[in-house]
Amino acid sequence: INERDTVSQANLQEAAHGLGVGMILDLGVDTFMGNVPDADTQALHAASLIGQGEVSVSPLSMAVLAASAAQGQIVTPVLVKGQDLADAQPAAGVTVTAAESKQLKTMMRAVVTEGSLGDLRQLTPNTAIGKTGTAEYGKETPPKTHSWVIAVHEDMAVALVVEDGDFGSVTGQPIVKAFLQD
């Protein structure tokens, strides 16, 4: 939120698109890859910077975001049904820069080594990166929440949302850890 005067909504939208948010996919099933809309007030812009306000994403878009941050380029998801993925190619278009990818990986690694996803340090090898989140919704005070976790370990990216969950580190972390271990 403190960056609202230095990071414009257009900058935020460009960064999100560079990580796959809003991309158009043809997977043979309906997909929603997220949206970072224009913000017509400073309050809405500030909320957008932390993924609140009118920003909307899906577990698929967040898994792509995490994988794209880790790979340094937009990762295109593919539905797998017993086929060889050797010919899979990255998506074309604007992508995250090498410097941006490095910064994101450093910050996401710190969430594991020093922050709210500490249990992921138990994965072998100890290289996981991730981020937790809490999405507020409704008009109640305090608002209801959904808990989020995105993580990347080795060649696997995962996004988890638990509807009406507690904080991502409390509700989502054990689920993501179990998924990445198996």
Protein language model features and the residues they cover:
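Beta-lactam-recognizing serine transpeptidase/beta-lactamase-like catalytic domain environment
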Residues: 1-164
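Short, gly/Ser/Thr-rich active-site loops of penicillin-recognizing serine hydrolases
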Residues: 88-92, 174-182
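Short amphipathic alpha-helical face segments that pack within enzyme cores
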Residues: 58-64, 171-178
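A short acidic/glycine-rich loop-to-helix N-cap element
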Residues: 162-172
